[in-house]
Amino acid sequence: FKRPLNGEDDMREKIVLIDGHSILNRAFYGVPDLTNAEGLHTNAIYGFLNILFKILDEEQPEYLTVTFDVHAPTFRHEMYPEYKGTRKPMAEELRQQVPVIKEVLQAMNIATIEKAGLEADDLLGTISHSCEEKGMDVAIISGDRDTLQLATEHVKIRIPKTKQGRTEIEDYFASDVKEKYGVTPIEFIDVKALMGDTADNIPGVPGIGEKTATKIIVEYGNIENAHEHVSELKPPRASKNLDEFWDQAVLSKTLATIDIHADVPFDLETAR
């Protein structure tokens, strides 16, 4: 997955952006339960730091920031109150590790960022977009495949999997997303708009699964164009349902789209 480096790319500065809650979550469920002498659960902290050090060793970035979700309604909840409504609450053993990892990161002088009304994905998207525009390379570390829509030639999405305490990482530039999913990172949003997402409780269009959604988007490029040719869609049920549930498809696309122009108070120097 390493990109061939030419002279110019060697000169590009790099930032690593870590989706804090997502990686803690992955670590929590991937590392057996550990507690310290005071009875604090530490497995997520341990697993998170393992992933962090592995990434830093591989990426050697000039900048690093960890984003966190704020426990508050986001603009998506305001638009669709049922958004993420099926999520189970965070396990108490994991919840108690969140403030501790923030303290650990602070002690290590690692910048963290969170903002009410936005999800970590929006912070990742906005910061990665602005860093790429500055001519930097970006590595986003997240367990959430929604972030694949952010992949470009210079933004790499790294999805860690921890099994038996060992971490393996899947890497995606834009070309890798296309290779694995058959669509570009931007089209990935439209596939999700059609098929929905049970994890985030995004409704999508009834009766359209991943296969049909992918086929439609490969052929038509986006939901708007598919809707213009709705009578031609196969199978007939997909055609009928996209027409009938069009508003739901549009809503789903908005919910699934990461904001890359959010108002984020980010100062690159603090991430150095």
Feature names for model-found ranges:
Residues 11-65, 69, 75-80:
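Non-catalytic, usually N-terminal nucleic-acid engagement modules in DNA/RNA processing proteins
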Residues 13, 32-35, 85-266:
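Extended two-metal-dependent nuclease catalytic cores across DNA- and RNA-processing enzymes
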